Amino acid sequence: ALMNSTINNNLPILSNEGGLSAYLEQIKKFPMLDAEEEYMLAKNWRTNGNVKAAEKLVTSHLRLVAKIAMGYKGYGLPVNEMISEGNVGLMQAVKKFEPEKGFRLATYAMWWIKASIQEYILRSWSLVKIGTTTAQKKLFFNLKKLKNQIAPQTEGDLRNEHVDEIANK
């Protein structure tokens, strides 16, 4: 838990103000690691609990998380939420990564990232599935899409005119 809270404070923020494109630009600034550097950082994290080493491992793989999350865009869920879930998976991977086994972190982390995103999708879908017909599911996702389109303009505060706008679509 200490690693997650410490690293989370230093990660780029995926917010509604800057949006996804601003976040993607931010994460491009983090350098990729070569195999030797990755091994040394992972060893330093595992042996000494060096949080800075873990942070470098995480930040150098944020692009991988974004790429994997983009592959799940067709599920009708917010990409930024899938990226956030993927980042949690990446942190789990860094926490459990054993560099001595000879694999690169990206290979190992990919499974954790995908698992976190898929778990999020299943949680989201199961909320919809319980007692809903196909028409209700479609309505639910259309409402969610409309809400996401309107949210940036309203800053989350839905006034009567916004409710009317949604109702008329």
Each model region followed by its residue ranges:
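Alpha-helical promoter-recognition and RNA polymerase-docking modules of transcription initiation factors
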Residues: 4-130, 134-153, 165-168
